[in-house]
């Protein structure tokens, strides 16, 4: 198994699909990486030489992925909460942020129903 950005990339999968195992790299970015490194999208990871894998590592390192990206996202949410803006308040209360209705629905975000005490 090749190791890129601290993640074991599956050997049996095509390069584009295997790169999506890294948090922060989707199909579009994986295709862009393959195009910029001149590695075939349909080539399997086990078929790549060590030099090609090193080129992939260097290309992936240009992007914010895995731990750095997770940290950046959590810091952005924390910043919104510290500002006290509407989105920050909605994050703090674990409610939907983007105008969805909450009288009904929103159960995933709000969690299981709490019984009314008498």
Curated annotation (Swiss-Prot):
A biological process term (GO) from this entry: translation
Disulfide bonds: none
The organism's place on the tree of life at top rank: Bacteria
GO cellular component: cytosol; small ribosomal subunit
Region (Disordered), start-end ranges: 94-118
Subunit description: Part of the 30S ribosomal subunit. Forms a loose heterodimer with protein S19. Forms two bridges to the 50S subunit in the 70S ribosome.
Protein name per its UniProtKB record: Small ribosomal subunit protein uS13
Organism annotation: Shewanella denitrificans (strain OS217 / ATCC BAA-1090 / DSM 15013)
Taxonomic classification: Bacteria, Pseudomonadati, Pseudomonadota, Gammaproteobacteria, Alteromonadales
């Amino acid at each position: 198994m090749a190791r890129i950005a601290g993640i074991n990339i599956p050997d049996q999968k095509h390069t584009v699909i295997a790169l999506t195992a890294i948090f922060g790299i989707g199909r579009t970015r994986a295709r862009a990486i393959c195009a910029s490194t001149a590695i075939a999208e349909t080539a399997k990871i086990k078929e790549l030489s060590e030099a090609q894998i090193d080129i992939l590592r260097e290309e992936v390192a240009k992007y914010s992925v895995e731990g750095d990206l997770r940290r950046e996202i959590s810091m952005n949410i924390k910043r919104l909460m510290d500002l006290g803006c509407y989105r920050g308040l909605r994050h703090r209360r674990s409610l939907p942020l983007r105008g969805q209705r909450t009288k009904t629905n929103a159960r995933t975000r709000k969690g299981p129903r709490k019984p009314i005490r008498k």
